[in-house]
A protein has these predicted regions:
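Stable alpha-helical elements in mature extracytoplasmic
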Residues: 32-39, 48, 52, 71-78, ...
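C-terminal cap of thioredoxin/glutaredoxin-like
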Residues: 1-6, 73-158
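Structural alpha/beta surface segment adjacent to cysteine/selenocysteine redox centers
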Residues: 1-80
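Cyclophilin-like peptidyl-prolyl cis-trans isomerases
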Residues: 136-273
């Protein structure tokens, strides 16, 4: 999360909520869950919530097997290490206010129906259990969400002259790449490509998918391979062939799902015809 906040400092608001897995007196879960939450909150009273939070997370192996009494001693020692007023921390740690706070956090989680931790909600949507919370996935969701602000609501109007020859130049780190656009063969694709280029869609993007001996793919500002302009247009099947290196075509996720992504062949690819 720290990496995400660093990458998107003006676009993410991170809200943390405790869900200490306390359990019930009859069926307790984690004997140190409540005290962990209380420790972070006690440190927070001195402006060091995240320092204690991070120490608990990073050093879990050191304290997870301790007794509750020894864990409390560990917390007090850690409070001194991170620069807290230890006496105040010790008083706050087991105060009735924080004991009640931890219990309420558990009760609220139960009422809400939380299944466990970690539990993540992004813009009101629960993060699916079958998708890992690794950085790439989280960053992709942020990038795709931000892309929505740039997307269009419909296909561009047809403005090109299908009798003319159009040439586009890709400016890359390796030098310029000139592309012939066949308006007579693929008017929808050419019209869309020019429209997107004129609106800065392709500025500063990368080739997010490069397969040596096959293709290099670009056209997604997020670099995830899932981004598009907000509209689709139909396939245009012509007599043109992917019979040599340097042929450009539209990349899609199935019939008639063309958008902004395109590929350039490294070698003949008759399977793409």
């Amino acid at each position: 999360m720290e990496q995400l906040l660093s990458e998107y400092p003006n676009d993410i608001r991170y809200v943390f909520r405790h869900f200490p897995l306390i359990g019930t007196p009859e069926n307790p879960f984690h004997d140190k869950a409540a005290l962990s939450a209380q420790a972070a909150e006690a440190a927070g009273k001195q402006g060091k919530f995240w320092e204690m939070h991070d120490a608990l997370f990073e050093e879990q192996r050191q304290w997870s097997s301790l007794s509750v009494t020894d864990f409390q001693a560990w917390l007090i020692e850690k409070a001194g290490e991170i620069g807290l007023n230890v006496s105040k921390f010790e008083t706050d740690l087991t105060s009735q206010a924080l004991v009640d706070f931890a219990q309420a956090a558990w009760d609220n989680g139960q009422t809400t129906g939380l299944s466990g931790t970690p539990f993540l909600v992004v813009n009101g949507n629960i993060w699916p259990n079958n998708v890992s919370m690794e950085y790439f996935n989280l960053s992709a969701v942020v990038a795709l969400t931000l892309l929505e602000e740039k997307q269009f609501t419909q296909c561009p109007k047809m403005v090109i002259d299908q009798t003319k020859q159009y040439v586009a130049t890709l400016v890359t780190e390796k030098g310029p790449v000139k592309i012939e656009l066949f308006a007579d063969k693929a008017p929808l694709a050419v019209n869309s490509f020019i429209f997107l280029a004129q609106n800065g869609w392709f500025d500063n993007i990368s080739f997010h998918r490069v397969i040596p001996g096959f293709v290099a793919q670009a056209g997604d500002p997020t670099g995830t391979g899932f981004g598009g302009p907000g509209y689709y247009f139909k396939n245009e099947i012509t007599d043109l062939k992917f019979d040599r290196p340097g042929v450009l075509g539209m990349a899609n996720a199935g019939a008639d799902t063309n958008g902004s992504q395109f590929f350039i062949t490294f070698a003949p690819a008759p399977n793409l015809d």
